């Protein structure tokens, strides 16, 4: 009975759009190609993956964790249970910083930026990729999140980021805050 309940719950969660995303991921075909081939048959291995993905969605696992990635500011970030999923509206924060930096650029020779609670590294890495003359420090209290952010730095070929495990509330770290000319954070919703 619980299995049938789970199947029913999953069927409501998997909209045609989400199904196309899953199908595109597993087949490597674009959405347009999938629409052009409505009778596409999955291999047995692909069908097993698809069934597992739908089950995971039914268990309230985020789509980005099921797919293993999230798109953010034009880049693909590895995404899994080690950090929360980057929120689309956070891209506006990155855009705002980049726009303001172009104004401040004449006043400061280099940007020394701190990203507090870096998670996947989406803010720190997106800014570091755009502001190549900057020094970016990505801080997180979670070793697991930092390991994910480091993997994303490697995938995106970003080298101007230092990763630090630490607690911003720690007095020792607090004394170092004055070395940064920009501090950014987009903590999880409470």
Language model regions located:
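Active-site/binding-pocket entry motifs
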Residues: 28-29, 83, 189-190
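A generic helix-loop boundary/linker signal
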Residues: 12-13, 40, 80, 113, ...
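SAM-dependent Rossmann-like transferase core, predominantly class I methyltransferases
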Residues: 52-105, 109-131, 136-151, 165
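Histidine kinase transmitter module recognition
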Residues: 11, 26, 82, 155-156
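Intrinsic disorder/low-complexity segments
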Residues: 1, 98-112, 160, 172-181
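N-terminal auxiliary segments of SAM/dcSAM-dependent transferases
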Residues: 1-67
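S-adenosylmethionine
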Residues: 130-135, 139-190
């Amino acid at each position: 009975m619980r299995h049938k309940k789970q199947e029913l719950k999953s069927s409501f969660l998997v909209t045609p759009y989400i199904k196309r995303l899953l199908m595109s991921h597993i087949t490597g075909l674009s959405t347009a190609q999938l629409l052009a081939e409505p009778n596409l048959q999955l291999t047995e291995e692909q069908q097993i993956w698809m069934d597992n993905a739908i089950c995971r969605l039914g268990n309230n696992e985020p789509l980005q964790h099921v797919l293993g990635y999230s798109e953010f500011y034009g880049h693909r970030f590895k995404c899994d249970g080690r950090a929360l999923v980057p929120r689309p509206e956070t891209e506006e924060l990155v855009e705002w910083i980049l726009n303001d930096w172009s104004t401040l650029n004449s006043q400061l020779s280099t940007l020394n930026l701190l990203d507090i609670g870096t998670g996947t590294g989406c803010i720190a890495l997106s800014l570091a990729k755009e502001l190549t003359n900057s020094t970016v420090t990505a801080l997180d209290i979670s070793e697991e999140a930092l390991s994910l952010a480091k993997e994303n730095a490697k995938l995106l070929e970003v080298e101007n980021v230092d990763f630090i495990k630490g607690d911003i509330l720690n007095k020792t770290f607090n004394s170092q805050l004055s070395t940064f000319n920009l501090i950014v954070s987009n903590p999880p919703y409470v």
